[in-house]
Amino acid sequence: MAAPTLGRLVLTHLLVALFGMGSWAAVNGIWVELPVVVKDLPEGWSLPSYLSVVVALGNLGLLVVTLWRQLAPGKGEQVPIQVVQVLSVVGTALLAPLWHHVAPVAGQLHSVAFLTLALVLAMACCTSNVTFLPFLSHLPPPFLRSFFLGQGLSALLPCVLALVQGVGRLECPPAPTNGTSGPPLDFPERFPASTFFWALTALLVTSAAAFRGLLLLLPSLPSVTTGGSGPELQLGSPGAEEEEKEEEEALPLQEPPSQAAGTIPGPDPEAHQLFSAHGAFLLGLMAFTSAVTNGVLPSVQSFSCLPYGRLAYHLAVVLGSAANPLACFLAMGVLCRSLAGLVGLSLLGMLFGAYLMALAILSPCPPLVGTTAGVVLVVLSWVLCLCVFSYVKVAASSLLHGGGRPALLAAGVAIQVGSLLGAGAMFPPTSIYHVFQSRKDCVDPCGP
């Protein structure tokens, strides 16, 4: 079979990236819109704690997927993926008109509509890791990196949209008596939360359309079979086959020779290698990086950044979200296949993470507060920390690709388990024991 054209390959990478964009865009969008919705919802700034619990409950979606695989074995991931996408689109579309509706629960008003729809979206997003990733086992490893690039966009684009909206803008006017800062003045957003959720719905519709386009291209994609017993499609030229074989030979989870030559057979007879030392280490590494980037560090981001000002906080959020796509681009060009190298990068990421955790513990008066150097250091630390850990996660998942569908399914589970453990570990110190102290706007607690 002739090698696919450059245009078709570029289109496929684009569709895979847009497909990955829909994985966590809904929940990420809710998080970045919290500063707007808390003004009108009865929970106020306790809403993030409620939302953390709701997102954790979203892991119940994994049980639904497990039940589906038991009742419909061999049906693949297409149906669960489409269900996830429909739930995401419908959930965000309903948020637009209903997010501000409240109802009495146990004698107190609560955001019943907002939290219920957030639970639906959390279940869809949590389920995406164990449905989207196994689907990509039908494609060569470079497309997996495009998927993680899109997953990074699922965090970046809602952040950019929130910045355009003008979330969190305030001014500290001087008090007329003693010249100190008076009460903060909040600027109104450029458009309401309903418009934000409609824009988020449009992003998810685009992602769902990209998946449909991917299915239409599937018979022409390299290394993809249209059916379990159908003919296998070759990568193309002998040179491409040799290059793919060299790449697969470097993987710690080795595939059969037929896959290394550029074909994807039905079941993977070497899936047991997932339980080798290499496979277990890579899965543990993915769980650890997910715990840090999806659970531990997000819980303390406001404590580490807000003492340096709203600008530092917004720069850390947006540029930190951009670090994920940047790491994916880097992995496309330079992929670390050495376990020792991945360990070294993880230690480097832990160094940045330890600095950020120290800033959060020392809040509201961390070192270099009120200086430009402090702002630069905290923003740079967030960007480098997330970039390093994102690269490690992409590299580990690319190496796990050699184990086929079972390995990518296990990778998705590792991501979810790590994220859940990280969030669960940080909930008591942040929401129950209040170990971290926040800094109030327009108040200087560090003065003489």
From Swiss-Prot:
Localisation per UniProt entry: Cell membrane
Expressed in which tissues: Widely expressed. Highly expressed in the testis, placenta and small intestine. Expressed at lower level in other tissues.
Region (Disordered) residue spans: 225-267
Keywords of this entry: Cell membrane, Glycoprotein, Host cell receptor for virus entry, Membrane, Receptor, Transmembrane, Transmembrane helix, Transport
Swiss-Prot/TrEMBL catalytic activity: riboflavin(in) = riboflavin(out)
Pfam families: SLC52_ribofla_tr (PF06237)
Topology of the protein relative to the lipid bilayer: Multi-pass membrane protein
GO CC term (a single one): plasma membrane
Regulation: The activity is strongly inhibited by riboflavin analogs, such as lumiflavin. Weakly inhibited by flavin adenine dinucleotide (FAD).
Disulphide-bridged cysteine pairs: none
Residues with glycosylation annotation: 178
Disease: Riboflavin deficiency: A disorder caused by a primary defect in riboflavin metabolism, or by dietary riboflavin deficiency. Riboflavin deficiency during pregnancy results in hypoglycemia, metabolic acidosis, dicarboxylic aciduria and elevated plasma acylcarnitine levels in the newborn. Treatment with oral riboflavin results in complete resolution of the clinical and biochemical findings.
Role, per record: Plasma membrane transporter mediating the uptake by cells of the water soluble vitamin B2/riboflavin that plays a key role in biochemical oxidation-reduction reactions of the carbohydrate, lipid, and amino acid metabolism. Humans are unable to synthesize vitamin B2/riboflavin and must obtain it via intestinal absorption.
Annotated protein name in UniProt: Solute carrier family 52, riboflavin transporter, member 1
Organism of provenance: Homo sapiens (Human)
